């Protein structure tokens, strides 16, 4: 991680941190060094999603937001009954994990519904249902990317696995390392070559986009969980399940499936 070059004010404890590049923390008999990166700028005071006046959703067991959730970061609604964000290092790590999982979930949800929608409108796929598509690798003709044999033609699960590891690993390594020259200071919002449209040029608009990204990402993670459950219970894709529900809501609904579900059948 990039080291801080200015004095920091901790939003978790309200205490001034010493203006040094590294913070030393003693652990047992030894000593570990923890490097913290300063945010480039604080969230805009004019946004309703930041600061003490932001919308709060505290849940049934919290009367007020904890002191370490001050509204500095996007998606902070003041709810942390379990105290998962109390430790600054853990909070920073969890924020990064949430954003990365949100982005993958949004891509995944789009990838689950798009082939089914296209197939329903006449586009030919070998298999449009997301959890069945991978099995086409073992079919006689293999799996054609986007149903086109002139693109990627896959017949080896090991080759697909290797490509996934290499490509995804390269992208994540590129992001975490700060790009080819290590110029990126914030691995969550790297900007630069990762922002060719310049969406982060305006700080006010960028702060709003961070909130929108997390909102949509959280919904996408719940959606993916729902797709997993649907696949196990009904054996159908999300679009087909939606069509069945709209055709007969009284029969095709979550309650009916939950009360009649028998594992293994």
Curated annotation (Swiss-Prot):
On cofactor binding, the record's note says: Binds at least 14 chlorophylls (8 Chl-a and 6 Chl-b) and carotenoids such as lutein and neoxanthin.
Residues that span the membrane, as ranges:
151-171, 219-239
Q: Tell me the disulfide pairings in this chain.
A: none
The family assignment reads: Belongs to the light-harvesting chlorophyll a/b-binding (LHC) protein family.
Residues noted as binding chlorophyll b 4 in the record, renumbered to the chain: 164, 175
Gene name in the database record: CABF3
Origin species, per record, is Polystichum munitum (Western sword-fern)
Residues that coordinate or bind chlorophyll a 4? 216
- Name this protein carries in UniProt: Chlorophyll a-b binding protein type 1 member F3, chloroplastic
Concerning PTM, the database record says: Photoregulated by reversible phosphorylation of its threonine residues.
